[in-house]
Each structure stands twice: as structure tokens, then as C-alpha cells.
Amino acid sequence: MKLYWQEKYPQAFCWSFGDSPALADELAALVVAGKKRGTCSSLVSYQKEQPPVTPGSYHIVLNDTGDAVCVIRTLALRLIRFNEMSADLAALEGEGDLSLAYWQAAHRAFFEREGNWSPEMELVYEEFAVLEIAP
């Protein structure tokens, strides 16, 4: 499936969500189930991506074993500070109980592991649409 999608979307990036195999599977499952339509990264991490993600970009989402689970397309990007995250954008990420409090706790832990967390840190928030799901 990954090879098929790489041929169909030759400019697509292949990657997995999160920073662990368990998180990669959990978040990919939320995307496939239609619950996750947004994600964010620290601006520091975003600036290291080559080429950078832009609206219209295609992505092949992988699970923890590197198998392709779906193709998504970036619809919009916005710059937002961690402490300015809205409840609506937090819920769009589809994680936990969908609350802003859950989002703050989970993402603070993630960004602390990354070594970039502060309440004022800048995030790149991405909204995306699912185009195809693996059978």
C-alpha cells in the first residue's frame, strides 16, 4: 500500500505521529476513525522539516511498523502559542476526552520529552483531511 500511494502521491511525505510506537498506532487509529483532523508541532521542530509542510501537502501516515494506514492532505497551517490553544482546536486533535485540559497535559508531556516546552512556546497547528484509508 505504501508503495502504491508513493506512486500515486509522489511528493507525499511518509511519517508517523507521536514519538513512540504506541503513540504512532494510537494517533493513526484516531485519524482512520475520523476523530483526529488536526495536529501540532513545535515551531522549532517544524523549522527542521525538509521540505517544510505547506497547505496542499500530501502525507502518507505510517503505523509503528512502517505500514501505510492512510493518506492525508494539509488544509491549513497556523502559528499559535501553547498557552493560547483553544478548546476547539484541541478537540480537533481527537485525543483523550477532547478537552483543552487533556490536550494541555498530553502535549506538555510530549514537548517536555522533545526538550522544547514552555507556556509561551510557538506551535505550528495543522488541519488536514483524510483522502484514502488502507483496506
In which residue ranges do the predicted regions lie?
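Mixed-charge, low-complexity intrinsically disordered regions
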Residues: 1-71, 77-135
